[in-house]
Curated annotation (Swiss-Prot):
Keywords: DNA-binding, Metal-binding, Nickel, Repressor, Transcription, Transcription regulation. It comes from the Bacteria. Ni(2+) binds at H77, H88, H90, C96. The lineage of its organism: Bacteria, Pseudomonadati, Pseudomonadota, Gammaproteobacteria, Enterobacterales. Disulfide bonds: none annotated. Its cofactor is Ni(2+). NCBIfam families: nikR (TIGR02793), PRK02967.1 (NF002815), PRK04460.1 (NF003381). The gene is nikR. Homotetramer. Binds 1 nickel ion per subunit. The keyword Transcription regulation applies. Belongs to the transcriptional regulatory CopG/NikR family. This is Nickel-responsive regulator. The keyword Heme does not apply.
Length: 145
């Protein structure tokens, strides 16, 4: 770990100190490390097409939209190797929130998410990607039985 010196304006430091007072962090270094990681991740381009990643796909959709539920189910079944789990929440009479956890090659995960988000009736879609490292192996199509 390296030690660095930063110059920050008073307003920015006040916001960082407020985060610490809220009880989420022990010190400024922890806050700034997390902010730096988040900033680097948000500035990064799409995940490497071949590198493994994990991701969360969030989207809101109109469950009364014609055949949408069937199309989404078919899309997920066609790409079952990417899908780890899904959470379904009814927001109101007509809207549902789906959170799907995905794992696979960055290009495949991105294309899959774009396909889901592009479906007519899907709103507010967002993909959050975490690049893989040694602990994130690509899925493999055989069982361990």
């Amino acid at each position: 770990m390296q030690r660095v010196t930063l110059s920050l304006d008073d307003d920015l430091m006040a916001e960082i100190d407020a985060i610490i007072r809220a009880g989420n962090y022990q010190n400024r270094s922890e806050v700034i490390r997390d902010l730096a990681r988040a900033g680097l991740q948000s500035m990064a381009q799409a995940p490497s097409p071949s590198a493994c990643c994990v991701a969360a796909l969030f989207y809101v959709y109109d469950h009364e939209s014609r055949e949408l539920s069937k199309r989404l189910t078919r899309t997920f079944h066609d790409h079952h190797d990417l899908s780890l789990a899904s959470l379904h929440v009814h927001l109101d009479h007509g809207s549902c929130l789906e959170v799907s956890l995905l794992k696979g090659a960055g290009g495949e995960v991105t294309r899959f998410a774009e396909r889901v988000i592009a479906e007519r009736g899907v709103r507010h879609g967002k993909l959050v990607v975490v690049p893989g490292d040694e602990g994130v192996a690509p899925p493999h199509p055989h069982s361990h039985d």
